[in-house]
């Protein structure tokens, strides 16, 4: 895009408004180089970056990069094999530290969905070793003692010599204090000296380094410290040499990474620039506009960014609208409206937020041209007809259908009749070339052109006849009218004269009356639109309030739900502990008395009332497999309340069923158990093992033994089956069980071991003998 338009519309002044929001020199440089873009994807990406930055600020209000110097010159010097000075190394050190901080920030970032910024965050490289090396230089520009053993040794010697000199001079001060002009140790030419009164200069042996301006004081380096001062001078030279070597070494460490460090610095600067754009958007109540794909424009409540209290206006360029002609007198803000449109486009195409309301839409133009002769503009510049036409010729020779043309006072500066004809012909050429154009003029002849010509629309700036002042309100679709008669009348001109003037221009008066009616209708429409907008704003506020209340309610609901879940879990834990106690009592008593069985059943039913097993995955699965027929004797069932397996033995006259559940006989209603399978199905080979204890053949171990195969099971499924298996084994008075878990990755085996170790009814357990499965099978003794 041509750079001339940037000066004409004062775009650099707009860019200057962003400076206060930037912290890094890199971002300042990016702002200086910023120019409008013509690639919609690049523009949209920058808008996405701003939007994502706003989402970051929702979670982290204080997000900032920090103040960073531009390190492009130090990096260039590194590439030329030059060594960096301390300040340059500090600047790079700060960039590396900021890079590490930004990486940590991204790693900890939650509740924010990023796309454009994610690519930036993930391109940052960390250099912990370089950061460690650069810690030897502190931010004050001092090379720390630990930078090298040699430097540490030199500084240790320096301190020793300095202490020795100070002690020697202190001794002289005590002995010869009356000879001194001041009771202190001074320094001249980098050497420690004493201020001796001139009358005693021969009483203290040493080298004179200076004499005061009055001649009364002589600065003498006593002979006793000359050798020590010589040593200090040498040590200072050694220190400088060692520091230079350290700077060279640090520069060499940085040299291979210049490209990556430069990339980090660019990302930090660009992130700071995005942050600055968001802060501008927030402070100025700006927005990110939509991008149209057909050169349509819709600017809602758009404001001029350089004015202190700009009037907001709506402006649209529909697809079938090519030319807008703003007619009317030379006051009222026509030029400002031209610049407002141009600046909104330049800002948007530069990836900057614009001063408008949500719902605004911008087009993407390859070029924007302007001819603005601003007698009344922000920057005044006079334009003769010749220079005016020269600019118009350049525009007509260059502009095409992908351009936006802005012309102020088209055809001005020459004979009104010829100027109006010329203006009309130029606008017609632009219309036929399908070039989006906005032009201002005070020629009344162009009103008719705007009304009669397709794809052309009139517009004007509102004028308040009551106050005789312009309101700066843009009225699209309404041509401008002269207010001369009304102004003259209100200023006190004789009514007879005004009437005579109106009679002399009857035709124009009729047109003005029509325009006046249009203005009134437009003003009324705008008032209604403003009322609608106010209602929309109230609705938005209401919606926000409702959303806030909903979020607060959801938060309270989640807290109460979590509290309830904890209480339920405590109930379940208590119930499980009590069930373990019941099972242990059942196991301990080989002979049960009837009343004990009834008591145990009562306790189990009481537990069932406390624990809701409706969400148990095993029960849900069993329910899905329930046969679509009535239950019958011999069917396998699962008792819903306990999750225990049993078999139907008989049906009572009242419709209830008798079931054998382990050692216990139970009376159940039809809705208190789930049918698993038929007897015939039970005799068929099982494709998949379920939670059931299979009687094993007698082994040499005491008591019966059961086996559970967990191979191929998922962790959660295996643990559910193991838990039910142990419970059933205890109910069946098993003394020993086998759990086949295989070797595999060891996850199931370790889980089985952990489960058995904490189960109170498992006396001990061990892997099976090698011949019986080895570490792929665990034998547990119950008791």
Curated annotation (Swiss-Prot):
GO BP annotation list: mismatch repair; negative regulation of DNA recombination; rescue of stalled ribosome
Positions annotated to bind ATP: 328-335
User: GO molecular function, one example?
Assistant: ATP-dependent DNA damage sensor activity
Question: What CDD domains would the database entry show?
Answer: ABC_MutS2 (cd03280)
Keywords for this protein: ATP-binding, DNA-binding, Endonuclease, Hydrolase, Nuclease, Nucleotide-binding, RNA-binding, rRNA-binding
Q: Which PANTHER family match?
A: OS10G0509000 PROTEIN (PTHR48466:SF2), OS10G0509000 PROTEIN-RELATED (PTHR48466)
The subunit structure is: Homodimer. Binds to stalled ribosomes, contacting rRNA.
Question: What is this protein's function?
Answer: Endonuclease that is involved in the suppression of homologous recombination and thus may have a key role in the control of bacterial genetic diversity. Acts as a ribosome collision sensor, splitting the ribosome into its 2 subunits. Detects stalled/collided 70S ribosomes which it binds and splits by an ATP-hydrolysis driven conformational change. Acts upstream of the ribosome quality control system (RQC), a ribosome-associated complex that mediates the extraction of incompletely synthesized nascent chains from stalled ribosomes and their subsequent degradation. Probably generates substrates for RQC.
Protein name according to UniProt: Endonuclease MutS2
Q: Which gene encodes it?
A: mutS2
């Amino acid at each position: 895009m041509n750079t001339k338009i940037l000066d004409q519309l004062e775009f650099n002044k707009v860019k200057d408004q962003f400076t206060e929001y930037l912290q890094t020199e890199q971002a300042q440089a990016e702002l200086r180089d910023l120019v409008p873009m013509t690639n919609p994807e690049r523009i949209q990406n920058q808008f996405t970056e701003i939007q994502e930055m706003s989402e970051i600020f929702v979670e982290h209000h204080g997000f900032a990069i920090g103040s960073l110097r531009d390190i492009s010159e130090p990096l260039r010097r590194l590439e030329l094999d030059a060594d960096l000075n301390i300040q340059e190394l500090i600047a790079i050190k700060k960039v590396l530290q900021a890079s590490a901080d930004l990486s940590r920030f991204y790693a900890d970032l939650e509740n924010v969905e990023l796309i454009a910024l994610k690519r930036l965050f993930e391109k940052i490289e960390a250099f912990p070793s370089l950061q460690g090396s650069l810690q030897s230089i502190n931010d004050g520009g001092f090379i720390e003692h630990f930078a090298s053993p040699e430097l540490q040794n030199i500084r240790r010697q320096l301190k020793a010599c300095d202490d020795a000199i100070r002690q020697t001079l202190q001794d002289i001060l005590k002995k010869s204090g009356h000879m001194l002009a001041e009771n202190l140790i001074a320094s001249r030419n980098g050497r420690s000296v004493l201020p001796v009164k001139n009358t005693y200069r021969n009483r203290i042996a040493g080298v004179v380094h200076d004499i005061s301006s009055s001649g009364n004081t002589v600065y003498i380096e006593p002979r006793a410290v000359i050798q020590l001062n010589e040593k200090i001078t040498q040590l200072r030279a050694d220190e400088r040499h060692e520091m230079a070597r350290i700077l060279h070494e640090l520069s060499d460490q940085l040299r291979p990474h210049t490209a990556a460090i430069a990339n980090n610095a660019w990302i930090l600067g660009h992130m700071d620039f995005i942050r600055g754009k968001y802060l501008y958007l927030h402070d100025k109540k700006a927005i990110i506009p939509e991008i149209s794909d057909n050169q349509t424009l819709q600017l809602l409540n758009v404001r001029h960014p350089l004015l202190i209290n700009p009037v907001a206006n709506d402006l649209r360029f529909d697809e079938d609208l090519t030319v807008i002609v703003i007619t009317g007198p030379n006051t009222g803000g026509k030029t400002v409206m031209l610049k407002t449109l141009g600046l909104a486009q330049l800002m948007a195409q530069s990836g900057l937020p614009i001063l408008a309301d949500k719902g605004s839409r911008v087009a993407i133009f390859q070029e924007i041209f302007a001819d603005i002769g601003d007698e009344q503009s922000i920057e005044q510049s006079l334009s003769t007809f010749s220079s005016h036409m020269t600019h118009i010729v350049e525009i007509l020779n260059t502009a095409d259908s992908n351009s936006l043309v802005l012309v102020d006072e088209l055809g001005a500066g020459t004979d009104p009749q010829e100027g109006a004809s010329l203006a009309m012909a130029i606008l017609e050429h632009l219309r036929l070339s399908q070039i989006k154009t906005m032009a201002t003029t005070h020629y009344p002849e162009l009103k008719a052109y705007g009304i009669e010509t397709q794809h052309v629309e009139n517009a004007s700036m509102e004028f308040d006849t009551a106050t005789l002042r312009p309101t700066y309100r843009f009225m699209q679709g309404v041509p401008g009218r002269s207010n001369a008669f009304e102004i003259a009348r209100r200023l006190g001109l004789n009514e007879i004269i005004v009437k005579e003037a109106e009679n002399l221009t009857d035709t124009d008066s009729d047109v003005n009356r029509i325009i006046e009616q249009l203005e009134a209708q437009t003003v009324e429409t705008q008032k209604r639109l403003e009322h609608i907008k106010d209602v929309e704003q109230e609705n938005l506020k209401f919606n926000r309030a409702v959303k806030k209340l909903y979020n607060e309610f959801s938060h309270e609901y989640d807290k109460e739900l979590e509290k309830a879940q904890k209480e339920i879990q405590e109930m379940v834990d208590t119930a499980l502990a009590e069930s373990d106690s019941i099972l242990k009592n059942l196991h301990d008593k080989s002979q049960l008395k009837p009343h004990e069985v009834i008591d145990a059943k009562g306790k189990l039913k009481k537990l069932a009332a406390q624990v809701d097993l409706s969400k148990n995955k095993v029960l849900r699965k069993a329910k899905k497999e329930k046969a679509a027929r009535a239950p019958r004797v011999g069917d396998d069932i699962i008792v819903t309340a306990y999750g225990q397996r049993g078999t139907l033995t008989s049906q009572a006259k009242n419709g209830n069923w008798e079931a054998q559940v382990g050692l216990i006989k139970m009376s159940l209603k039809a809705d208190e158990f789930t049918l698993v399978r038929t007897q015939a199905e039970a005799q068929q080979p099982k494709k998949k093992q379920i939670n059931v204890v299979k009687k094993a053949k007698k082994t040499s171990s005491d008591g019966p033994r059961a086996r559970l195969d967990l191979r191929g099971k998922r962790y959660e499924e295996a643990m559910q089956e193991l838990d039910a298996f142990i419970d059933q084994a205890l109910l069946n008075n098993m003394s020993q069980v086998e759990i086949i878990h295989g070797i595999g990755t060891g996850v199931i085996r370790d889980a089985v071991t952990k489960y058995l170790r904490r189960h109170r009814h498992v006396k001990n357990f061990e892997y099976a003998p090698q011949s019986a499965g080895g570490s792929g099978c665990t034998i547990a003794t119950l008791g």
